[in-house]
């Protein structure tokens, strides 16, 4: 085995050992036994919500154990793979190098997940996108970002539910709200919060001038019962209207779309993509709860800041630039992480940006402690 390859394998083994210490397979196995015992209780499904939580956690913990076991086996197999490759020639060596590269990426991805230890990091994510300065280009840019996140979710086998889209008159969207389902979606996607800037030749300008557009991304954790975000009916005004599509045309002959206004705060949430008014109201209420939870968290952070013990709640502002002209580059202004192929990013290849953002956030938090 080449010295540089031996060094890479040794480093990989060391990284996984550190991950194993953090995740603690013995504790995970113990938790599996506890959950399996709960799942075998015939009365469990008398409470469907509790049953769902138990089965979901059981699947999650089992998946973590399987991931650790698989990665450990692959690392242990690498020296043998290279030993055989030395005997078989260049083609076998190329396959071994490919396995090393893929394994390194898999271990690094798991390492990043161990950094997601915040109170809400394991939750699903609500994403709100709003077009900003830039007119029709900004509306088009907001729609491009929505497509980017949905593509990323689909590539990673995460279901997306679109709750609401407000279409702009000429092209694009004014705003959109959707939920990305799956464990740790909030922890991963929360680093996307802030202003995203696009620089390109405007397809809507007859003179082909360069245009700068902005869109704002808000990422919220999905609220659970344990958060105790109770909203009295008296504090919510409910308005119903007909769903609309691009250009403002009605797409529903009944008043199924719902707008909720939280009277004490003035927060407004709409949902029109479900099939019925009841479903739209339930989805809108979930988003309203998420917004109120975030408001509560911001107030708590502001109190800590006043005591000199907290960070900046607006860390994500002006966080990334996507330049399509006069050169091609996506650059995160917090991490300095760069990608020279913007189209790949816009097609949902944002794992590198997310990982860099998570590492940056951890370093920021450690610097404040």
UniProtKB/Swiss-Prot annotation:
It is found in: Cytoplasm. It comes from the Bacteria. Gene3D superfamilies: 3.30.160.20, 3.30.70.1660, Release factor. Belongs to the prokaryotic/mitochondrial release factor family. NCBIfam families: prfB. Peptide chain release factor 2 directs the termination of translation in response to the peptide chain termination codons UGA and UAA. This is Peptide chain release factor 2. It comes from Corynebacterium diphtheriae (strain ATCC 700971 / NCTC 13129 / Biotype gravis). The gene is prfB.
């Amino acid at each position: 085995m080449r010295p540089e390859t031996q060094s890479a394998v040794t480093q990989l083994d060391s990284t996984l050992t550190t991950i194993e210490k953090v995740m603690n397979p013995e504790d995970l196995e113990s938790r599996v036994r506890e959950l399996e015992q709960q799942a075998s209780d015939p009365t469990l499904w008398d409470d469907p919500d509790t049953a769902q939580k138990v089965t979901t956690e059981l699947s999650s913990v089992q998946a973590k154990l399987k991931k650790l076991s698989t990665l450990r086996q692959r690392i242990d197999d690498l020296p043998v793979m290279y030993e055989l490759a030395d005997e078989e020639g260049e083609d076998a060596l190329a396959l071994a190098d490919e396995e090393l590269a893929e394994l390194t990426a898999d271990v690094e991805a798991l390492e990043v997940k161990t950094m997601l230890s915040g109170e809400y990091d394991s939750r699903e994510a609500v994403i709100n996108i709003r077009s900003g300065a830039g007119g029709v280009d900004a509306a088009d840019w907001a729609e491009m970002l929505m497509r980017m996140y949905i593509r990323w979710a689909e590539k990673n086998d995460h279901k997306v539910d679109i709750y609401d889209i407000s279409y702009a008159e000429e092209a694009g969207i004014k705003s959109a709200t959707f939920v990305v389902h799956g464990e740790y979606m909030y922890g991963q996607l929360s680093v996307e919060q802030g202003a995203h800037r696009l620089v390109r030749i405007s397809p809507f300008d007859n003179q082909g001038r360069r245009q700068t557009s902005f869109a704002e991304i808000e990422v919220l954790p999905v609220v659970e019962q344990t958060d105790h975000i109770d909203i009295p009916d008296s504090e919510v005004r409910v308005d119903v209207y007909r769903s609309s599509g691009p250009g403002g045309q009605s797409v529903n002959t009944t008043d199924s779309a719902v707008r909720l206004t939280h009277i004490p705060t003035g927060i407004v949430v709409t949902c029109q993509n479900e099939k019925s008014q009841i479903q739209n109201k339930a989805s809108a209420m979930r988003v309203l709860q998420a917004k109120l939870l975030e408001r509560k968290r911001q107030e708590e952070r502001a109190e800590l800041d006043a005591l000199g013990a907290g960070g900046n709640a607006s860390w994500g502002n002006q966080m990334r630039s996507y330049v399509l002209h006069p050169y091609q580059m996506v650059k995160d202004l917090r991490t300095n992480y760069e990608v020279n192929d913007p189209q790949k990013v816009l097609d949902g290849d944002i794992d590198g940006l997310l990982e860099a953002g998570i590492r940056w956030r951890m370093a920021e938090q450690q610097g404040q402690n």
